[in-house]
Amino acid sequence: MEKFQGYLEFDGARQQSFLYPLFFREYIYVLAYDHGLNRLNRNRSIFLENTDYDKKYSSLIVKRLILRMYEQNRLIIPTKDLNQNSFLGHTSLFYYQMISVLFAVIVEIPFSLRLGSSFQGKQLKKSYNLQSIHSIFPFLEDKLAHFNYVLDVLIPYPIHLEILVQILRYWVKDASSLHFFRFCLYEYCNCKNFYIKKKSILNPRFFLFLYNSHVCEYESIFFFLRKRSSHLRSPSYEVLFERIFFYGKIQHFFKVFINNFPAILGLLKDPFIHYVRYHGRCILATKDTPLLMNKWKYFFVNLWQCYFSVWFQSQKVNINQLSKDNLEFLGYLSSLRLNPLVVRSQMLENSFLIDNVRIKLDSKIPISSIIGSLAKDKFCNVLGHPISKATWTDSSDSDILNRFVRICRNISHYYSGSSKKKNLYRIKYILRLCCVKTLARKHKSTVRAFLKRLGSGLLEEFLTGEDQVLSLIFPRSYYASKRLYRVRIWYLDILYLNDLVNNE
């Protein structure tokens, strides 16, 4: 980002908030290309993912593209002519993808500068474990035990592209960039619809930025109302929702807002509320009554429908009572479990029995969904009975065994924090027997004859990896075997989930 700031200060674009001239600078394409090289493999730059590009950066393509952008009529190609029209050996879809990569990098600059200025003079705690998927579970174990209800909300996607453009209007003040972005976004989607049957090149950085800007606008309104809920009992609310792109819908929204929201906002005051967003969903945990949770539910529905023009059904907001219902969270089924404890106390000649109840977060493995995923990838049938993996029989024995061991180790690694390990045993059994059936099918033998010939040493490969990991946690090895499946272990080095089948 320091490189970007240096170039922006040189061009004077930062002071004037003009981003459009950067689309015609060759060094921005170079920086976007270099920035893509430093990303993870799953978010590589479009310059590397395009097979026609020969995995090399070409300044000639960039120069021709810039010349073509000066004549915008040459960028507009009818959908029926997309196959015939190519530019320097590439279709127009490739160039719209190049522009989308560049736009994502350029528009991130004001966001990064604003974020950096907000943290100036503050010391941020840097911890590798905070990036882990499992880092949230210790927080939930401490907080959810004091809550009664959880609101599970599915964040809707905007169905119209103009909504995304309007959201960016609040952040990007350059009208030329917004017009150019609108034009390229519509043309890019038209090209994508034309190539829908072909394997198109994904640009996760661009669409991730659009989604984050959409969610950022929603959360800014939600957090503002959450903090100011105690001051929203006055009859005038116009100042609270003043936005630069809100002209056409302002009267209709205030009519709905004034009629419905005063009674809602009057009951939204709750200092003990927690908000968590993950995988396109968000949960709202609080210690309140069902009436207040219903108020929050219809608040979300009205917010999405009236402010973002997104049809949002109330069925997408679920109210879960933690003591009775299970909450799907990061691949676990979480609920609160009551553990009764009886304590005997004796004072002089009198003894007392004190009944205590301890609330504990119970995280279970969703066995039905995991078996469904394994059945989809042909590890078992829909009933959970292991079958042979026919597509892997062409590989060597060591390769087949290593694949199954890796998958089993990843599942064990991720679901080791479950409170009950019975379902984990079943998943491991499916994978082990599937591995044996695959090897037996390759050697054209039965499972019984294959195991009799190789012995039990074949299945020991599934246990060695776990013993090596757990030895770091339990220094005394004789305790590791006894507490292997009775202790909940949250591994804080899981940053993202790989595809279990294609994980190499």
Curated annotation (Swiss-Prot):
GO terms for biological process: mRNA processing; RNA splicing; tRNA processing. InterPro entries: Domain_X, Maturase_MatK, Maturase_MatK_N. GO terms for molecular function: RNA binding. The keyword Plastid applies. Its main location: plastid. Keywords: Chloroplast, mRNA processing, Plastid, RNA-binding, tRNA processing. It comes from the Eukaryota. GO terms for cellular component: chloroplast. It is found in: Plastid, Chloroplast. Usually encoded in the trnK tRNA gene intron. Probably assists in splicing its own and other chloroplast group II introns. HAMAP family: MatK (MF_01390). Belongs to the intron maturase 2 family. MatK subfamily. This is Maturase K. The lineage of its organism: Eukaryota, Viridiplantae, Streptophyta, Embryophyta, Tracheophyta. The gene is matK.
